[in-house]
Amino acid sequence: MGFLKFSPFLVVSILLLYQACGLQAVPLRSTLESSPGMAATLSEEEARLLLAALVQNYMQMKVRELEQEQEAEGSSVTAQKRSCNTATCVTHRLAGLLSRSGGVVKDNFVPTNVGSEAFGRRRRDLQA
């Protein structure tokens, strides 16, 4: 998707580079110097700097547009908590509920090995 957004930039940059190479091949300086109406001309170095500045400005503009689109897409996504209905999750929720409850239930409650450490134990680990 990002490649499709950069393809117009690639086309424009290729055309600009082609034009810059074409301007170097054609002796335009002699025609510009011969016309008295053209007082301001750019040297080759100034033309290259101007072209580089234009390309850099265009790239910065496209990057800003992409960032704004990504921020707009990112803000529309809402975070949702995953619901877990497996036996493990239900057991964890019940153990949490029992541990938080007070009164007589807490006095008679013997804690079981419920948690990440309890699962996957072998029998020899439990007997030791």
Swiss-Prot record:
Function: CGRP1/CALCA is a peptide hormone that induces vasodilation mediated by the CALCRL-RAMP1 receptor complex. Dilates a variety of vessels including the coronary, cerebral and systemic vasculature. Its abundance in the CNS also points toward a neurotransmitter or neuromodulator role. It also elevates platelet cAMP. CGRP1 can also bind and activate CALCR-RAMP1 (AMYR1) receptor complex.
PROSITE patterns xref list: CALCITONIN
A GO cellular component annotation in the UniProt record: extracellular space
Disulfide bonds listed in the record: 84-89
UniProt keyword Lyase present: no
Database matches in Gene3D superfamilies: 6.10.250.2190
Main location: secreted
Family assignment from sequence similarity: Belongs to the calcitonin family.
Listed GO biological process terms: adenylate cyclase-activating G protein-coupled receptor signaling pathway; amylin receptor 2 signaling pathway; artery vasodilation involved in baroreceptor response to increased systemic arterial blood pressure; calcitonin family receptor signaling pathway; calcitonin gene-related peptide receptor signaling pathway; cell adhesion; cellular response to nerve growth factor stimulus; cellular response to tumor necrosis factor
Protein localization: Secreted
Propeptide segments, given as residue ranges: 26-80, 125-128
The keyword Secreted belongs to this UniProt entry's keyword annotation: yes
GO MF annotation terms: calcitonin receptor binding; hormone activity; identical protein binding; neuropeptide hormone activity; protein-containing complex binding; signaling receptor binding
Residues of the signal peptide: 1-25
Species of provenance: Rattus norvegicus
Full protein name: Calcitonin gene-related peptide 1
UniProt keyword terms in alphabetical order: Amidation, Cleavage on pair of basic residues, Disulfide bond, Hormone, Secreted, Signal
Residues where Phenylalanine amide is found: 119
